[in-house]
Amino acid sequence: MSEDTSQPTDQQAGTALRRGWTTGACAAAAARAAFTGLVSGSFPDPVTIRLPRDRSPAFALAVHACGDGWARAGVIKDAGDDPDVTHGALVSVTARPGAPGRGVQLRAGPGVGTVRRSGLPVAAGEPAINPGPRGYIEQGIAEAAAALSAPTDVTLELAIEDGERLAAQTLNPRLGIEGGLSVLGTTGLLVPFSCAAWIDAIQRGIDVARAAGIEHVAGSTGRTSEQAVQAYHQLPDEALIDMGDFVGGMLKYLRRYPVPRVTIAGGVAKITKLAQGFLDVHSRRGQADLAALAETAGRLGADATCREVMATANTVAEAFDRAQAAGLPLGDAVAREAQQTALNLIDPACSEVEVLLFDRRGQRVGRAGWARD
């Protein structure tokens, strides 16, 4: 795949990470090629599409075929250096003549999911093809139709090879998307390890929970804390928000779109960072201050030796172990400090917050009970 303006790399950002293309961009390329094959009997290879921000990538076709009343084309998704589950998957579109005056009609084929719950950008019952890709798929068909002097009335069935199996590795089952993957991509360009993509998933999870009338959501930093908080509160899957490192991103969205009860659950290291004011608790944003953690222990009665051992520990978990050995309720104290950070971000008139700390085995080691301010 190539682009007439620049290669899909991350050189502009000064990194070695290679950019890729979203499933939506691949589907748009396959759709334009399939439509052209349906109308003219020949397939453009490579096929060029227009994306937002003046990008015009060209995609090589991996498959193309046509028969009586249908044409199919597909491209292999290149996710660049992003660990996307669909990297290397065949994204294909089968085009068939549509009803006169109906324009472009999109259908979910094998491996593409169908929305079953409200709260997402696509209505329940519709193929899980987000508004961004829908827009540039339709734009590509309009441009191809104009070039061929043909109407735009066409039915496009999108498919993703092995998509139903791959979807189990995504948030789709929790969001109420059944049968396969979503076709995503606001701009069509896939930036490796994009924070924006994760935050968007957090927001969609909150939207689905609100639409389902759920009044208690739990944001967790990882799988262990998610399983632990679900067991602790007996929450349905729809109430679980995989916030990862983006505690601030979740809380800021909840300020705009509140839920009455919000639990923040995580391991000792990440919740300690939240307690110390970090809103993004990834290690790249900095390390927890062990000296400050030792001071917290001091306020609980830790002696000088205990504080020194904690301040010079190799990890937060090691410092916690020392405090627990001394019989100090450090987990509860850190949870209260983390809760105060969180309360500064939400609307106290609309939500109350609880913080839970878990160790690596999923055992609760700290809690700050429900509070609004």
Curated annotation (Swiss-Prot):
Query: EC number(s) in its UniProt entry?
Result: 2.1.1.195
Question: InterPro entries attached here?
Answer: CbiD (IPR002748), CbiD_sf (IPR036074)
Keyword S-adenosyl-L-methionine listed: yes
Write out the similarity annotation: Belongs to the CbiD family.
Q: Which organism is it from?
A: Halorhodospira halophila (strain DSM 244 / SL1) (Ectothiorhodospira halophila (strain DSM 244 / SL1))
Q: Which keywords appear in this protein's UniProt record, sorted alphabetically?
A: Cobalamin biosynthesis, Methyltransferase, S-adenosyl-L-methionine, Transferase
Q: Could you tell me which Gene3D superfamilies the record lists for this protein? A: CbiD-like (3.30.2110.10)
Q: What is this protein called?
A: Cobalt-precorrin-5B C(1)-methyltransferase
Catalysed reactions listed for this entry: Co-precorrin-5B + S-adenosyl-L-methionine = Co-precorrin-6A + S-adenosyl-L-homocysteine
Tell me what gene encodes this. Answer: cbiD
Q: Which Pfam families does the annotation name?
A: CbiD (PF01888)
For whether the record's keyword set contains Lyase, the answer is: no
Which Gene Ontology terms describe the biological processes this protein takes part in?
anaerobic cobalamin biosynthetic process; methylation
Q: Which GO terms describe its molecular function?
A: cobalt-precorrin-5B C1-methyltransferase activity
Top-level enzyme category = transferase
Cite the annotated pathway.
Answer: Cofactor biosynthesis; adenosylcobalamin biosynthesis; cob(II)yrinate a,c-diamide from sirohydrochlorin (anaerobic route): step 6/10
